[in-house]
Regions:
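A composition-driven surface/loop motif
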Residues: 2-613
Length: 613
């Protein structure tokens, strides 16, 4: 029988970034503090030790098995009076209670009902939603109060809906068991199948688990007053189609007490996200191995102590930082639950609603631009223009930093010079945190940020992939921002932004440069080698006066040309930065040695194949 609840307005509270930090697949050694500005001394924190082997990154066979036996399953037909055909479940008016392990096929519609799973702690329950429509006025539509694990399977060809009310609270449970989602589980929760599920989390979250939340298939449309998908211990997604609109975080894992939990791992799926706060927020690690992720609106895109991008396609439009690696003690906001903990790795290697972002700003428009591999056109750049879509990119091969089996790299980036600064790079920032890391091993990544494009309070490692950043136009942020070192050993990068706090890489086995060059939204930005052959290009999404470039074809000590709207700037690429500092001074000399600027009204490179990164 459904417990009665007192009605209480359930308004979303301002989200604070709480972070503990873990490192996915990294060993444990401290990161050297880089040089800092003479007027501001860098401080660096040391985190706790962890072992990636302790993290459960896998999917069980049962997670991925959406099959069921229709003949032996108990059939539940919803309505004003529910009907149960089989054992293990009972009906009380419109409400249904499941008390035994087994498979239950749920169909029909109920305007005020709850499906309650209350089983023994070792029971596994499979709920097959086959055109089920459940709305509950005083609690979750589906509430797994107790079980070992619950599997929610979306039957082939089915269309399902679950919704809760705008406000409710429990009166006969302690607060620790209060359900906080339209589909809520106290136990591990797995969703699979090929059908569709629409979730309206009118009170708080859309889909939530106090343990693991695993999704291996299905099509999901989630609207939530707070978070869209939340798995306290972890969120793991193998496949699916997702449209998530949330007032706070779209996808979140919030365990800040266990160094092996609190992570998000995405292995596939097609994602469209509109979030009032973070698109993906993990207390420890965020890992993207595959999938097509489009974040149309957010405050910050990917946020965790450590962010690993190993593949897939990422497109993020953010009103603050697009990617942010920060621990609890170094993130920009905290709440009472913040323990301020952090974890080490081996470096060898605000309420919102409507269309406003977390900072109250209208989200920037999705930029248009080319995103292709380094060009293979003829040396005179005469091949025809083959523009691509905004967020797609040509196929590429990761030459360095490839991680076997799509696991995070074992801190394989190259360490930076202790006084690495601007080529235009920066040494160490204030509040540097050695536990924080952004590591890019593959994939196609396009970022449009009003704040920093990538902000790591620790290190940044680019080992492969294609990275395009349309950074800030304000002087207080940069396309790249890091606290200790930034290294590049592979991949392709074009990062455009303002020069006020600009940083480039601190070192790498692949040559790079920061170039002082200005352009406007819509301008074609082209990198040419000494023979005039285009090696990379992109169409700017917004104004900029600084560019950081690096491709697999660039060599240390070799001269290149950056062409912006017919204006050419020559520069020399290097594998090391040339001066220390906080990164607040703009491009460094090595990144643009005695640049020779010229105006060329006939930009032949505009006729070459599109490409950047």
């Amino acid at each position: 029988m459904r417990r009665k609840h007192d009605m209480l307005s359930c308004k979303s509270k301002t989200k604070a970034i709480i972070a503990a930090a873990l490192a996915a697949a990294v060993a444990t050694s401290s990161v050297a503090v880089s040089g800092c500005d003479s007027e501001q001394e860098s401080t660096q924190e040391t985190g706790l030790t962890f072992d990636i082997a302790d993290m459960d990154l896998d999917y069980s066979d049962r997670d991925q098995d959406a099959s069921y036996d229709d003949n032996s399953a108990t059939k539940i037909t919803l309505g004003d009076t529910a009907n149960v055909d089989g054992s293990g479940a009972s009906a009380n008016g419109a409400d249904v209670t499941i008390t035994a392990a087994g498979t239950y096929i749920i169909s029909g519609s109920a305007s005020d009902a709850q499906v309650l799973v209350e089983c023994a702690g070792d029971d596994k329950v499979q709920l097959v939603l086959d055109n089920a429509d459940i709305t509950c006025s005083d609690g979750p539509a589906i509430y797994v109060k107790s079980a070992d694990k619950c599997f929610v399977t979306l039957a082939e060809g089915s269309s399902n809906n679950v919704s809760d009310a705008a406000g409710y609270t429990l009166t006969d449970d302690d607060g620790s068991e209060e359900p906080t989602a339209a589909l809520f589980s106290n136990a591990d929760l797995t969703l699979n199948g090929t059908g569709s599920l629409t979730v309206n989390g009118n009170c708080n979250n859309g889909i939530g688990s106090k343990d693991d939340l695993v999704i291996c298939g299905g099509s999901y449309t989630v609207t939530a007053a707070n978070d869209g998908l939340r798995g306290r211990d972890c969120v793991k997604v193998k496949d699916g189609t997702f449209e998530i609109t949330s007032t706070q975080d779209a996808v979140k894992s919030n365990n800040d007490e266990d160094t092996t939990r609190g992570f998000i791992k995405i292995d596939g799926g097609t994602w469209t996200v509109n979030a009032g706060d973070d698109a993906f927020h993990a207390e420890t690690a965020f890992i993207l191995n595959d999938g097509d992720v489009t974040v149309e609106q957010c405050y910050e895109g990917y946020e965790a102590v450590q962010v690993y991008l190993n593949g897939g396609t990422t497109y993020i439009t953010a009103s603050d930082d697009a990617i942010n690696a920060a621990s609890g003690s170094s993130s920009n906001t905290q709440n009472a639950d913040d323990k301020g903990r952090s974890f080490s790795h081996d470096d060898n290697a605000g309420d919102t609603d409507g269309n406003q972002q977390g900072d109250g700003q209208t989200p920037p428009e999705k930029p248009s631009g080319d995103a292709g591999e380094a060009d293979s056109s003829s040396s005179d750049g005469s091949s025809s223009d083959n523009s691509s879509t905004d967020k797609t990119a040509d196929d590429f091969t990761v030459k360095n930093g490839q991680v076997p089996d799509n696991q995070p790299n074992q801190g394989g980036g190259q360490g930076g010079d202790q006084n690495a600064g601007a080529h235009g790079g920066a040494g160490g920032g204030m509040d540097a945190d050695s536990s924080c890391l952004v590591q890019i091993n593959g994939g196609s990544i396009t970022l449009d940020a009003q704040g920093d494009g990538i902000d790591s309070n620790g290190s940044l490692e680019v080992c492969g992939g294609k990275l395009i950043i349309f950074g800030p136009t304000s002087g207080g942020d940069g396309a790249l921002d890091y606290g200790t070192t930034a290294t590049i050993t592979g991949g392709s990068v074009i990062a455009l932004g303002s020069s006020g706090m600009a940083q480039s890489f601190s070192s790498g086995s692949q040559a790079f440069a920061m170039v002082s060059a200005s352009g406007s939204a819509g301008d074609k930005v082209v990198v040419l080698d000494s023979s005039g052959k285009k090696i990379a290009s992109v169409k700017a999404a917004k104004d900029f006066d600084c560019a950081v470039v690096s491709t697999t074809t660039m060599s240390d000590g070799t001269s290149y040309t950056l062409k912006v709207a017919g204006k050419s700037t020559s520069f020399t690429a290097s594998c090391e930065s040339s001066q220390g500092g906080m990164g607040a001074g703009g491009p460094g000399s090595n990144g643009n040695r005695n640049p020779q600027e010229s105006t060329d009204s006939s930009d032949s490179s505009d006729n070459s194949a599109s490409g950047a990164l």
